[in-house]
Amino acid sequence: MSKRYRESENDEGPSSTGTKKTKSSDGPLSKYTHGDYTVGWVCALSKEQTAATAMLDFRHGDLPKTSSRDPNTYILGSIGKHNVVIACLPEGEIGNNVAATVATHMISAFPSMRVGLMVGIGGGIPPKVRLGDVVVSTPVGEYPGVVQWDMGKATEGGSFQRTGALNKPPSSLRTAIGRLKTEQELTGSQIPQYLDQMAKRYPNLAPKYLRSDSLKNILFKAGHGHISKAATDSEAAPDENSTEEAYDDDEEDDEDEEKEACRFCDKSQIVKQTPRDMRIHYGLIASGNRVIKDAIFRKKLNKDLGGQVLCVEMEAAGLMDGFPCLVIRGICDYADSHKNKAWQEHAAAVAAAYAKELLQYVQPDDVDGERPVKDLLKQG
């Protein structure tokens, strides 16, 4: 029997609740080999990697490094009938180029890898997309699912023309999306159940990674910039930062940020939204090397791309050509000046849960039919 379909001696079996438990990899090395892993899962932040690891059905033991020049650390396990390798960008580093480097090392270390998932958080484009929703990259018109919005050239008249084209997600993953959509329409998504399982297996994750009443879905009108505390508690000033702030800001402000986000902002400028459940959206993701924290710029970018953008993020474009992957983003902010970290863990969890659900419908034979990613790199 293929190692894809059996449990390792280091794997922990199903729990009494019927869900499979993961196990720490502090024990002996895995009985699997580097050639047994076909699905690569890339995260940008450690909180995204935490959510990904929590979604594994089984945790495998570690494997020895294949190269001393590979700086990545890998978390190994399985979801359904697929062996999965998870890697995260180095702490404090973000962007397309860093993501591409991590993926390149992963591909070299795991020669049988055929498909990839880029799973994590992103900024949503309102009004269609809301906090806590999931956006999945799928081809739209001339775009393959992800467009690098900051790659191009200046043209006559001062306009900006985007150049180059990225690859579409692997066909085995796109085929599975069609089946998943049907099953979700018939019986609903399994994401809530996967989140409940995560909370039972890892209770310490529940306070941040599950949605709670403390998470407020607040959208301000585009013309109302964030008002932050100035030098004294009695003063307030507009936040002039626009696009130069990374997702992980200074830790010292986290506690105040979550408790007092938009404390000084004009509440009359909040857009009224009818309450609804989490939704999954399929379409265009705009990727660039700068964090977007400006509602006016967000609207212009969406308009320039035909009004088709659902999400903005920073890593996907660096992967799409050399690492055939599907990009899955949980929405944690609206890419405006009111951006804060409150929703990040929950957004990471729903994105990881969607990836887990999708893999249930990805056929192993279809994955085996994809060309090894290392061969695609050699061809390129």
Can you describe what each PLM-predicted range is?
Residues 2-380:
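Intrinsic-disorder/coil detector with helix-boundary
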